[in-house]
Amino acid sequence: MLPLAVILSELQEPKTIVPVLSSLRSGSPVWSNISGPDQKHLVSRTLNLTRSSIQFRRWFGINVIRVLADNYKIMAGDGSQIIGQLLKLLEQCNQFTSAVYFKSLVECIDHVCDSIRGKPTMTRELLTPNLPAIIGLYLEKFSHDPAYLVSRLAPYIRAHPTTFRPFGNKLRSKIMETILSPAFSNFPDSSKDIFCNTLSTLCAVEKIEPEERWSSDLFSLIGELSNTLEIYGEFLNFEDDAELGKLLKKIPRSSSGESEFPSLSIDINDPSSFYSLPERLDILLRLIRGYLSAPTSFVAKVPLGIIALVVEAVLSINSRFIPFKREIRDESTKQIIRNTLQCAHSSALGLLKVLPSIFRGSLVPYMRRILGLLETLIPMKKKSLDTDQIVANEQFICLVLDCVACNISLVSYYQDSTGLVRLIDAAMAIVQPRSSSNTSSNTANTISSNGKKKKKQASVPLADVLSHQHLFNISVSESTTNHVQSFVNTLISCADLPSAQHNKVCKFVIVEAVKASHHIQEGTVPKQLRNLLVNAVLHPGFETTSILPIVCSILKEDELLSVFRNPRFPPVLKAVEVKEEEEEEEEEEESEEEPEEAEEAEEVVNGSRTEREVAPETKEVEPENKRRKIEIPEAVSVEPQVSEPQISTSLQHSISNQPEPAEPKNLRAPEPVKQANNPKLTEPSAAKDLREDFSDDSDFEMPEIDVDSDDE
């Protein structure tokens, strides 16, 4: 970073601009401790550069002002002086001013306005008073660089429509004058689009109902287009195509008011006059596209159905289906008319190409009919493709393929793939290797000759053609290959192609993959080709073969393809026996229940369960066989009043389940348990006798069992 003293000295005698601009940028340490006098000194030195008579110094000062405009303090203190000096420089520009200097000055003025716009106080004090002068100077210098100044005026129309209102008609007349000039056809497409888009934004300066002005302008353009299409009726028999007549009647006519477009003059004896017709159609279609694509600050209703009718009407005028009139007999005149029709079709395709990106799913109802019209644009020779015409009109075919891809991409699956057969064949035809016509004709003449050589020297170049014919092939341009790749990429992911066409597509993909193998050494594969290869693997169609090995050899580090090459399944779960888990759970439950049962057993032994036990009425000793029967669970369930047998049964169960039970210190219950289990009942009648004994209505009472007694 340069210190402030060095910057001031450099502004006095400028030599290199980059270090100065980098040191003055926003956030630089220079601004952290700059004083007020130093700031005034910096601004005055910069303004002195802009007042120099040397153009380089003025250009140097303009670029420094552009950097200083990011500083709020400088613009708040000296903004009015800076803007005034810039407007003086713009006023001094003339036809001898260099384009670099002029563009730098205009960009600096726009940057200063952008830095002020949005700040209420600065906008009120600096920008609003100077806006009329800025717009007026832009219109005054309009002839210096029309396309550039129109692009710079568009933001002022959107941001300041009220201030721009007095200049709206003047700008509109200048734009229309440029559009209707003969030189407009030589402008690049980007410049043409700028003029058309800016003209559509002028509707925002209307004081009342700008949306109505927008709609009326659009319908007037559509009516003018309909009138222009009827001129082709002077050369072609529209009466032979009833559908075309219906289409033209559905398109609204222009109003009876005076049109902004002058009438066309076409002389049948002057072939060059025919090209004014497609030029007028191109202007109208570009203007319609500008009205549809340019952003507006108001809500506008778009007649999408009429727009679709306009495109359909232009594409339906085709000399393949509509014959020429008898008056048109000259073959050269017919060929010129065919060429003008193709130019008109190209303009309509330009409008059709942008519609999917604007209206999306609203175009789906018109998609099938549009694709049918696009298929008719492919040159045919009887029932087969005219490959020579397809190759000769390579750019037009690429535009058709782009429109097809844009419309098919609106849906996730397109069912009617039979209508795409011609389009696929045409796409494959323009990417095939070609040989020049001169070499092919020379080769044919050589083969048809009788072997007589007039001169030995004449056969030298022909020998190269015969032995190394591949060196004379014309390579397909990269742009054409990209168009076809994009078209194929959309088709294989949205439609199931017929077997023959799918094989052609796969062959094309494999050839492109092999051609791209040299990119492996460079480490990069084009993104579009990468997507095409991946989609070709993901959508194999009805074929049993796969190009996965070839694609994997090229895209080795692709994560998606690595899943197909080395499938990674989820980790295998270990099988666990449920029985073991249940046994462990039972053991845990038993271990938790053992202390409780031990406490219950201790209470039973010590006679502490007085609350749960039912005291018997008598203390008679029960016979031995009766005591054994009480331990059976079935007998216990019969008498709900007796709870003592249930307690003894649970105690027995808890003790018998343990292999080596740990006896409590004062627990002496195991002895009566062993005595009760000593005799075994093997007869089934024992259980029956037990039930009969319990069901007997005798006066037998349950004696109290004294577990504390010592049998020994």
UniProtKB/Swiss-Prot annotation:
Top-level taxon of the source organism: Eukaryota
Record-stated family: Belongs to the RIX1/PELP1 family.
Keyword Membrane appears in the UniProt entry: no
Residue ranges, compositional bias (Acidic residues): 579-603, 694-712
Function per UniProt: Component of the RIX1 complex required for processing of ITS2 sequences from 35S pre-rRNA and the nucleoplasmic transit of the pre-60S ribosomal subunits. Regulates pre-60S association of the critical remodeling factor MDN1.
Protein name, per record: Pre-rRNA-processing protein RIX1
Region (Disordered): 435-456, 575-712
Species of provenance: Meyerozyma guilliermondii (strain ATCC 6260 / CBS 566 / DSM 6381 / JCM 1539 / NBRC 10279 / NRRL Y-324) (Yeast)
Protein localization: Nucleus
Compositional bias (Low complexity): 435-450
GO biological process: rRNA processing
Subunit structure: Component of the RIX1 complex, composed of IPI1, RIX1/IPI2 and IPI3 in a 1:2:2 stoichiometry. The complex interacts (via RIX1) with MDN1 (via its hexameric AAA ATPase ring) and the pre-60S ribosome particles.
